[in-house]
């Protein structure tokens, strides 16, 4: 059993860390307060291969695996969770759905520009009335002579406001429940397809989250993604990989919060000494560090399994996502506490970690849903 990363993986970590600290860190609060992500940074992310990490080179990707992908997301999120989230949604959800279920023609038309960074992707499953109950989708797709007509709305779509391509689920047969849901590829500018309200969020503010609306949106037949009626089942498989990226996202922010708390504790002086000399603070830091390392093991175990052909990793990805996200919330909370009053001030990074990490216990399946997934796997239930 080998716990060390390869030299190539360590070099990737160093490269992404250098990029994040040099290109992202100086702008974190500016982007957060503006609730806007500058698209001009995307070519730089693409140049590093971060917009197509897990896809073969023949489709414009970097040809790497989930371990490298998790490393990249962790390092981006250590500096800014919003950037990590943008990259994660683009790779794990939209692009990966096309890679896993698309025809060769669809991969060449859509995956190549997505993986090479010439386009940005979004993925729409959640609806105003269908959150954890994703099988309760109400958006419809009705077949006609020219293909399909979509009507409905999705919510909480990461990258929805500026995505070039969007993979969305819609009901194609109301009599079949979740087996009547299909996936479609939408293109920016298609008549009847547009972004809706941009959400004003607690955290991850530089990652733009919005509604997407379908109003008599005509979709050609070749934009059906995967077999008709298999969109929901496909989505569940896509979420297995997506949860690894959210786990890595949480891990990165937890690591960042731990480092911020440690740095502050060594610098802040009270009663004539650094607060790091007080046992109560030392105990907090020790617990934080232990939890972060435990989360790291779960995250990279899941990533390792995802890189193995034919191995199911549903339980492990849910475990990693559940544990890492809840650890991140606890660590960020302690980071604020160690900072004291300054933890409540935007001049320090503690409050942003505190706001950002909460999403990880909600997005791509709440902590409660993860516990259900894990329990069903343990009990042998479908």
Tell where the protein language model's regions lie, with residue ranges.
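Flexible, small-/acidic-enriched active-site or ligand-binding loops
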Residues: 136, 189-220
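Well-ordered alpha-helical segments within folded domains of soluble proteins
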Residues: 90-95
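Short, surface-exposed charged micro-motifs
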Residues: 138-140
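A short, Trp-centered hydrophobic/proline-enriched beta-strand micro-motif
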Residues: 117-125, 169
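A short core secondary-structure module
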Residues: 87, 151-195
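Alpha-helical interface subdomain recognition
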Residues: 1-89, 101-106, 113-118, 133-134, ...
